[in-house]
């Protein structure tokens, strides 16, 4: 086992603090509407320019192992806030730095770190309650657009697109962000359920011009296994022919005799039919077929249920208003499933999202949720160069999460003002001893850090701004860094989602508390590079 370096007490905290400062100083220049850009060198390709705090944080790796530990802990704050709220990463970093700095001073002067942490936790709890109490609910489309615009650093086009997307697909719908092939940014909305499987044979096409299959008011046969022979299918095909409606078959695969017969029937005009492969793989495929069955009011035919294909009746088939099948995807519009059953399935998927620990699983579950609940909106981000597109895409991602968070928990005045105002909640919080009281006052000072940093990035003096804002007791009154004016921030459209501010403060306090209570640090010793031995026969004697 390699030898380790161990640092104790103030030496450990000092090294750690240096790492915290390096990372936080690089991230905090991006805060606010007049935040600066950070250029990141890439091992291949052009450098990346970004104003996204978490992107900067993820790129920083320090040579000194102990300093790096401090930096990585702050990076963890940025990542956690990003996961929870999708925005507010820079605010969280600024708050962490402020709490750790003050906390380290208090510990160095002989205070009990555990009591300091208890004081910090009490203060944070009180502030979070105050923030929730003063939240405004989001009702109008304009407000959603404003949140998006602010999070996208004042880009109104992004705010507008996000508001439109949320209006179309609802709060549960999925909004995906892609890079456009052109310089224009555009929005495309897919209503209904779409999955990434196309028609199994081009002979099924009904609309030659658009090269796609269009089925009006079809029946849907949802089958878990492969269909190869025709015999089991005959009873259901005959029933569908008599009803005069089209039929869509969704199965693991349709091949051989079954596929050939379906194609011949379609070409002769006896039966309007199409077949697609089932989406997903393994257990996920089963779940998705069940989703389609619930959405269309049908039954997923599987051997687990003991239903044989020969015994399937029309009542077991799903119904939809329309189905459109293209080469690579299928869209089911307006399924005939009952609202209650769909809602029950939605709640079930939400519970799974809460429980899962895997990011990949969570993403897939959210996709399923969206397909059931509303639809999918795709924002294609355009730009003149690849660097610009990537930078804009970062901002659209941030803005999208911020608008979601705003709809979920409501809005607060932005620009760091909400935290500053919430400090009055600390007047009623008392510590059990002197050290806890110091912990509370550390938070009181730290929550000024975001507004000071926003002012500094905009070229103003933080202390003067804080003083002027405090003069007026109105919760929404503050300073607009974009215009340099004072006034009602709600009216000016300078707003932050409660969830973002809350997550930033809670995550910052959590990690800062851990850093303050650290007494020892252990890291691998740097390996000494030994010179390679001289190869045999390379001596100097002839």
Curated annotation (Swiss-Prot):
The gene is groEL2. Keywords: ATP-binding, Chaperone, Cytoplasm, Isomerase, Nucleotide-binding. It is found in: Cytoplasm. CDD domains: GroEL. Belongs to the chaperonin (HSP60) family. ATP binds at residues 30-33, 51, 87-91, 415, 496. Forms a cylinder of 14 subunits composed of two heptameric rings stacked back-to-back. Interacts with the co-chaperonin GroES. One of its GO terms (molecular function) is ATP binding. GO terms for cellular component: cytoplasm. This is Chaperonin GroEL 2. GO terms for biological process: protein refolding. NCBIfam families: GroEL, PRK00013.1, PRK12849.1, PRK12850.1, PRK12851.1. InterPro entries: Chaperonin_Cpn60_CS, Cpn60/GroEL, Cpn60/GroEL/TCP-1, GroEL-like_apical_dom_sf, GROEL-like_equatorial_sf, TCP-1-like_intermed_sf. It comes from the Bacteria. Its main location: cytoplasm. Its EC number is 5.6.1.7. The keyword Transmembrane does not apply. PANTHER family: 60 KDA HEAT SHOCK PROTEIN, MITOCHONDRIAL (PTHR45633). It catalyses: ATP + H2O + a folded polypeptide = ADP + phosphate + an unfolded polypeptide.
